[in-house]
Amino acid sequence: MPLSKKEKRILKSIVVASENDPDNPEFPADDPKFPATPTIRIEVPGFSKVWLKDESKNPTGTHKDRMGWEMVVTYRDFLLAKKRGQVKGSLPSLSIITSGSAAVAIQSQLRRYDLPNLKCLIDVNLDPDITKSMKKIGCEIYGTDLSKKPFHWREILTLTHNPDGFDITSSEALDPTTRFYDWLSYEIINNSPDYCFIPFGTGNLYENILNITKKELSTDNHDPRFMGDVKKLRYCNFFGATTNNPKSKADKLYSPHLPFVHYDEQWIRLYRHAGFCGPKSNVYLIKEQYLSKAISIADSQGIDYEPSGIAGLALMLQMRDKLPKNKKMLIANTGKTKYPK
């Protein structure tokens, strides 16, 4: 089935510079660069080498912008398949369970390329101002009690009135743990840290970083984007920071259910046992008192963040008595969403 005029225009407008050429990056679309966001040195009392990967510099303020771009690339795949005559009909819609950040990032990209609006399943208790911001940029909103139970992808599509579409939350075919944040993962591991602290919400970012690390430690034929130190990387401890407190300031890291996450005790134990990461790599619960201290440090240094985004700094402060003070620490700040006014 031939593409319509509109579809031809959309396809032409989606330019993927390269899959993995650091000299020809794909993100952000209007000003591609690698690395796409800066890594800056910060001062943390008691530590001599602390660096912060600052994803707040992305278009809508968080690392989710990278995932948003990958959804545009997915639509490009849909259009190319239709152009080849492999599929028929109109472009499908995408659905997602979201607390706001991912929705704003993805919908901002979809809107820019004139693609179908994102269908968002939100918790009935989500802040009305966030809901209003999402609606303002075209998100279609559907509310339910997300604490009730984990939702199957079929239920997510049903609840978002999207029977012929696809659910981003659950789809393995989208390669969420190797593709959503692959460029970001290289930007992080190329710093060759001894310790890396990463917010753990859906788990996609943590899993991406570990999977890219595993890939580079398992081959002599490195990805062109890899510029790190293999020996150092093998012993890097990757710490995920999360919470099980529904009232935590790090609200984006709390989820009553994570049915689609791969990480579990056995998953990380195998990675450690195979030598794909340092021996202390794991996901840890943060305490609110250390999150408050992290907030004070971030404020004092003009870092743009939300509490969930600097959970890694909180975890470093929480573990400070067990950490060497002269090793290279890298904290991933996943940023702060710029909600449309």
Q: What annotation goes with each model-predicted range?
A:
Residues 2-85, 89, 289:
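Positively charged, low-complexity intrinsically disordered leader regions
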Residues 4-5, 246-247, 311-341:
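Phosphate-binding loop/pocket of nucleotide- and phosphate-handling active sites
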Residues 21, 33-36, 132-133, 139, ...:
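Active-site/ligand-binding loops adjacent to catalytic centers
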Residues 57-74, 169-188, 304-311:
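A glycine-rich, Thr/Ser-enriched phosphate-binding loop motif common to dinucleotide/cofactor-binding enzymes
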Residues 65, 69, 95-113, 128-129, ...:
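Short glycine/serine/threonine-rich phosphate/pyrophosphate-binding segments
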Residues 73-81, 104-115, 210-217, 314-323:
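Alpha-helix C-terminal capping segments
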Residues 91-96, 101-159, 249, 341:
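Active-site-proximal loop->helix
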Residues 159-220, 289-298:
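Active-site/ligand-binding-proximal alpha/beta "capping" segment
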